[in-house]
Amino acid sequence: MKRLTIYCLTCLIGVSLLFAQQGVTQCGTPTGQPKFPIETYQELPDPSSPSDKDWAAVTIPQISWGTIDTRYAKHRLPQLKKQQLTTLKGWRGERVNAQAVVWTGTEVKDLNFSFTDFKDKKGNSLSDEAFKAGFIRYVMTDELNKDGRGACGHRQAVDYDSLLVADPIDTNLKSMSVPARTVQPIWVQCWIPQSATSGTYKGALLVKDGSRLLQQLNLEILVSSRELPAPSEWAYHLDLWQSPFAVARYYQVPLWSQEHLDAMRPLMKMLADAGQKIITATLTHKPWNGQTEDYFETMVTWMKRADGTWAFD
């Protein structure tokens, strides 16, 4: 009996440790992966199933330029006319974007991409650093604005459908496996160098399965003679709140440690590149009574002296 009890307790502890190491959704469903994945993560299952009838005709991977104005559903055939060339126009110093769409009826085990050189007729080229791309990943959401009124507050969960939507651009992931009957978009950006010579630069996005070329998507960048100043010189005022406390929790590092600052640096760089010039500083503990997942703590030391006066650092 004692052995049975010990065995049962051991199993319970093992299961508890297993789930303690995994992340869970807001409703408590285990995600099957670490609580704080750093390099990559598994997407949640899609509540909607692919249509056997629609996907039956897709026998090989299909790849085309899409539009940046559409969030393509993960398991629904994209409604677009196949396009192997797209043209982007921009000033020197401007960022221009495009979206490529991959959809496949069979598994693609090692989907990856790369850029060719981009040159104009005179031999001028755009630097490799001007281009970057990332897989668009899918996250779970619901019909937040179903009534069109844009209001928050209490609501009946059963009245709002859950769905996967294309949202984050994962620039960390360099290759991925794409299951059969799945759509996988790729976001492409060119930050035209301010030193670029005006003209038309031609190149391509190469989409591969391992080393096998699936499709060459041609891309033209039309560079204007006009110049956009560096983000630090913009008159544009961007003020997005930052949450250092969320960064420390996610990366599991001590607050305000060197590791914490290192984790924040690339995030702050992204904000600066977008024109952010404002730093968020919270003076009191739990302002707004901790409405956010990671409540804000005070960034100022409060000291009450023996004589009843206050000092702040």
Where are the predicted features?
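Positively charged n-region of N-terminal signal peptides that target proteins for export
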Residues: 1-4
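Short, solvent-exposed loop/linker segments at the N-terminal edge
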Residues: 88-94
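Extended acidic/polar, glycine-enriched regions
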Residues: 89, 101-119, 173-232, 261
